């Protein structure tokens, strides 16, 4: 295709659209504030914290589930609690979110907040705060959460299929996927560190055993093969972090250095490529990882937020009203 003399005009249109997008993003984020509920619901944060602490205390796996919920929500349609909506055609019903759990943890936190401040605090804000509190509950970093998100009334299963990263992605695909959400390579590696918590099913890591040329430690490979044969046992769970799966630390990266990453998308972060140096830095400097993770979570939690008079404040997080 040739633009000839019209190419100048053609180039200006995307630039104009880019400026609109940047200004819109900045405008939405500018409406977020750490003091958003100080007068309308001053006990909101303490109520959420108490609820999340209780949930994680009863089952430490809940910390991983909550952090994953925020990630999956923000990567599809922005951080608007659209993932929490139930029903046919919703993100929640998408095969891309098959295996995503923990909705009841957020429902419990929402119910607790509704009892003290009915109709005030959005599910999107509760999810953002809950992820921070879940991290702290298992020894992870804390960060400041700016508030004022509103809840969307729509949810898109098809978009979940295209926007969420997959466990079999290679490094270039991961970098591109995160870049599409405004997150750079270092932030991608830091956020992948959330895999210091939680588990994955055999159906998600089978490719790492049988369909990958990535290095894999022999004993680790043997253990995975026994738990996850070429067919069957799809629901068998294995920890993403072999050493301390219920504590937030940097052992996830130590596993990668010894070729014991559970998913393909884990091990590609340390595979004689551009991100090896970041992984090594996080192995040697856990405080750097914690700081980078916290900063990346702040940035991710403000992707595509709905603010002001847009959206709603749902009474029930699974119901679009």
UniProtKB/Swiss-Prot annotation:
Ca(2+) 2 binds at residues 196, 241, 244, 249. GO terms for molecular function: heme binding; lactoperoxidase activity; metal ion binding. InterPro entries: Haem_peroxidase, Haem_peroxidase_sf, Peroxidase_pln, Peroxidases_AS, Peroxidases_heam-ligand_BS, Secretory_peroxidase. It is found in: Secreted. Expressed in tracheary elements, roots, young and old hypocotyls, and stems in the partially glycosylated form and in roots and young hypocotyls in the fully glycosylated form. None of the isoforms is significantly expressed in leaves or cotyledons. It catalyses: 2 a phenolic donor + H2O2 = 2 a phenolic radical donor + 2 H2O. GO terms for biological process: hydrogen peroxide catabolic process; response to oxidative stress. Its EC number is 1.11.1.7. Substrate binds at residue 165. Belongs to the peroxidase family. Classical plant (class III) peroxidase subfamily. This is Basic peroxidase. It comes from Zinnia elegans. The gene is POD3.
